[in-house]
Amino acid sequence: MQPLCRLYGSGVAQCTCAVLGGVDAYYTPFVRLEKGEIRNKDRRDVSPEENTVPRLVPQVIASDPEELKVLTDFLASQGYREIDVNMGCPFPLIVRRGKGAGILSSPEKVEALLEMMKVFPEIRFSVKMRLGGQDAEEWKALVPLLNRSCVTQVTLHPRIGKQQYKGAVDREAFRAFYEACERPLVYNGDLLTVADIRGGTGSVSPAERGDAGTRAADESGAGAGFP
């Protein structure tokens, strides 16, 4: 569904909600700055007048705190109280700009974004990420930052950015991340069948943790979105 969302914008979510239903939350394509300004297309995609789904969560992508602040100020002015920050997009053009998975190799930059979130206590921030940008061990430096942050949910796609969507997802790495992460966790990646959803979290049961445990989400714009 992601290609359709990029082509047709918010109308895809409206149609899916009206015809199919059963989706807890819809996450938008990236809201981002272009030459210092929010794109008109992005403004339309998150316009309250254009959206009738019960729960729409804007997804933003940023490389520095000031960029995140501009995006958050705008979305808060539109009445949003949930924002998802993408640190997982693997596409080279995004990565080269230090956004998406391109930020994961720089823990200090990730920490700066997490600190900016604290400036907006009225907003519930979530984070979407991968195991790393270039190395599957990079997450180990990031989990302590997430545990100290105000994020309310982490979505993990267990590949590195360099892989994009090639190769197998690393379910054992997801398990290790789960054991280290103190935030509610969502699994994302290669969920094509019901069996994939049941087995996708590396045999982690939500019952193993007293909080929200783990959930599985697809890459369609419903559930966790697009890392």
Residue ranges and their predicted role:
Residues 1-227:
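Flavin-dependent oxidoreductase catalytic cores
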